[in-house]
């Protein structure tokens, strides 16, 4: 769960901000605008960075550590989808219309 207490966030936030700025460096002049091509390159660098962080903090691999890490990565994916993708898709449904076959699943 990413909702850690404020003290833990305080310890991490400046490092995270610095890393994010470092990753963005050279990709965009304006943080509001990045091409899909540049974003693809940036995602590769994010993947590299996360892979190194995971490897360095895991120390020696074990089945249980690998299982826990893959579980956390899955949770990150699900939370991103729940918080970012789902609201975006709901906006698009309202603006462009729903898929007609899905109407039977709509909540009252």
Region annotations inferred by a language model:
Residues 1-108:
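Solvent-exposed interaction surfaces and binding hotspots enriched for charged
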